């Protein structure tokens, strides 16, 4: 079935029932068509910054915000954007939103901004963002496009956080360390010391550990999909 097509089902009284568009968008974004775990898009930031939950959540929320704003903007002006130059226009819209996100993180979450570094502006080139703009937002109404951006962003964020949690736990024995850098001093109480390690497995927080962790997550997801 083509991406984003809504299946039509027959019910007992002979009428045709169309499943909820919202439900399908949510399931696609979180599981069936997850940008990171199914389409394998945006792997560069996914692998590079997911060495802790804090970094993963910071980049995930930034990407979610960019997806949401970009989808809404492009859907609003979809009838006015010339078809022949639509891609450069999409990139300009994405770059504008990313610049705003970068300035906000610089002002309110500077340590995380420093930690993520170049990967915040690189959201501009993330294929997930421009892919949803081209495949969905440019063809659908604003409310559906906004929810598509939200669902896709949540799927990306959850993938990042899951990989970050695995790597942080194995590498440092902790979870949610440094979350106060994102949410303030109150978040210090969320830190969990789950494994009492004198020295964690360094491989887990290095790039090879990211590939191994992602491979394990993909294997588990495929196992569930084929049951």
UniProtKB/Swiss-Prot annotation:
GO annotation, biological process: electron transport chain
GO CC annotations on file: plasma membrane
Entry's localization field: Cell inner membrane
InterPro entries tied to this protein: NqrDE/RnfAE, RnfE
EC identifiers of the protein: 7.-.-.-
Bilayer topology term: Multi-pass membrane protein
One Pfam family, short name: Rnf-Nqr
Enzyme class: translocase
Transmembrane spans: 57-77, 89-109, 111-131, 146-166, 200-220
This protein's UniProt keywords: Cell inner membrane, Cell membrane, Electron transport, Membrane, Translocase, Transmembrane, Transmembrane helix, Transport
HAMAP family in the record: RsxE_RnfE (MF_00478)
Function: Part of a membrane-bound complex that couples electron transfer with translocation of ions across the membrane.
PANTHER family named in the record: ELECTRON TRANSPORT COMPLEX PROTEIN RNFE (PTHR30586), ION-TRANSLOCATING OXIDOREDUCTASE COMPLEX SUBUNIT E (PTHR30586:SF0)
Quaternary assembly: The complex is composed of six subunits: RnfA, RnfB, RnfC, RnfD, RnfE and RnfG.
Stated family: Belongs to the NqrDE/RnfAE family.
Designated name of the protein: Ion-translocating oxidoreductase complex subunit E
The organism's taxonomic lineage, starting at the top: Bacteria, Pseudomonadati, Pseudomonadota, Gammaproteobacteria, Pasteurellales
Gene that this sequence comes from: rnfE
């Amino acid at each position: 079935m083509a991406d984003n097509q809504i299946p039509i089902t027959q019910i007992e009284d002979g009428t045709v029932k169309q499943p909820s568009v919202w439900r399908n968008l949510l399931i696609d974004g979180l599981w069936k068509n997850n940008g990171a775990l199914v389409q394998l898009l945006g792997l560069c930031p996914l692998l590079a910054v997911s060495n802790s939950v804090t970094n993963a959540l910071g980049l995930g929320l930034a990407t979610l915000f960019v997806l949401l704003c970009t989808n809404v903007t492009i859907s609003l002006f979809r009838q006015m954007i010339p078809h022949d130059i639509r891609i450069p226009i999409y990139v300009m819209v994405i770059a504008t939103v990313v610049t705003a996100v970068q300035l906000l993180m610089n002002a309110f979450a500077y340590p995380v901004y420093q930690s993520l570094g170049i990967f915040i502006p690189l959201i501009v080139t993330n294929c997930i963002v421009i892919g949803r703009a081209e495949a969905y937002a440019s063809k659908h109404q604003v409310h559906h496009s906004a929810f598509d951006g939200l669902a896709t962003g949540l799927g990306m964020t959850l993938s990042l956080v899951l990989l970050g949690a695995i790597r942080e736990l194995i590498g440092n024995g902790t979870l949610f360390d440094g979350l106060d850098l994102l949410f303030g001093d109150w978040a210090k109480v969320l830190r969990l010391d789950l494994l009492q390690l004198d020295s964690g497995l360094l491989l887990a927080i290095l790039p090879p550990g990211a590939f191994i962790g992602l491979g394990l997550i993909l294997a588990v997801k495929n196992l569930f999909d084929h049951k």
